[in-house]
């Protein structure tokens, strides 16, 4: 089913993006990869080639440069000769206290985690609607379900991204383009190094990658990864505010 799939991954050097790309590569997909670091991107591309993928485009770019978004999408579309799957997977986990002390850091994190991701989705959707086909996935987070004291700067961006993806998906209904919102919990990636996390709640990145791949191929509208987070977050959302405010987790 996946052989020859034309896949664009934005933020291709992130841990989650690499895990998804490995699954597509093993199925013989053709890949276009975009990320900030040219050196890291080359390393990722080499690994995917060994695994069976055909990397037809590598592009080092600052994804916060909004003016480049349509050009990046157009280059990938041309190199791949179409777009079957687009995955928007870049992001960062900012230091909450640093963002509280310096609002410029908070704004910079929102630019990465929300603004650039949202505008990339629009640029990709614009191209995919013409073909009347395709899956547009975006990596949001369970952190966007309810703001918590230790990561509400990050969580607020992901909440906005989730809402944006929901609205975009509704707008694209009937066009042949499906929007998939991906909501991981904590995942064992470099972004989580140094964070104080309950190890029982941290998911293996390859398990997450396989689940995201399946969601993209099925066109699932919303996917929690791992699935237990759907029920965990349902409980957290339902907590009365006075109880929620007393908790620290």
Task: Give the positions of each predicted feature.
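Conserved glycine-rich cofactor-binding loop
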Residues: 13-14
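Conserved glycine-rich Rossmann-like NAD(P)H-binding loop of the short-chain dehydrogenase/reductase
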Residues: 27-44
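Rossmann-fold cofactor-recognition segment
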Residues: 50-67
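Conserved mid-core segment of classical short-chain dehydrogenase/reductases
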Residues: 70, 85, 91-107, 150
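Active-site helix of classical SDR
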Residues: 121, 157
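Residue(s) in the substrate-gating loop at a strand-loop-helix junction
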Residues: 141
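C-terminal helical subdomain
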Residues: 181, 197-232
């Amino acid at each position: 089913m996946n052989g020859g799939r034309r896949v664009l991954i934005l933020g291709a050097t992130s841990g989650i993006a690499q895990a998804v790309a490995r699954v597509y590569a093993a199925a013989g997909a053709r890949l276009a990869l975009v990320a900030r670091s040219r050196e890291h991107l080359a390393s990722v591309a080499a690994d995917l080639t060994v695994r069976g993928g055909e990397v037809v485009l590598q592009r080092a770019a600052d994804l916060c440069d909004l003016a480049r978004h349509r050009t990046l999408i157009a280059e990938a579309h041309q190199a791949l000769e179409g777009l079957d799957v687009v995955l928007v997977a870049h992001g960062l986990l900012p230091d909450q206290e640093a963002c509280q002390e310096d609002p410029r850091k908070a704004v910079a994190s929102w630019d990465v985690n929300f603004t650039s991701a949202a505008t990339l989705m629009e640029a990709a959707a614009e191209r995919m609607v013409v073909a009347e086909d395709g899956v547009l996935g975006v990596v949001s987070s369970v952190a966007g379900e309810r703001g918590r004291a230790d990561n509400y700067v990050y969580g607020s961006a992901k909440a906005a991204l989730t809402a944006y993806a929901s609205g975009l998906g509704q707008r694209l209904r009937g066009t042949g383009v499906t929007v998939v919102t991906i909501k991981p919990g904590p995942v064992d990636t470099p972004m989580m190094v140094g964070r104080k996390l309950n190890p029982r709640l941290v998911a293996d990145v390859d398990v997450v990658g396989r689940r995201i791949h399946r969601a993209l191929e099925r066109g699932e509208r919303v996917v929690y990864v791992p699935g237990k987070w759907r029920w965990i977050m349902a409980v957290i959302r339902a907590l009365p505010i006075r109880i929620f405010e007393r908790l620290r987790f």
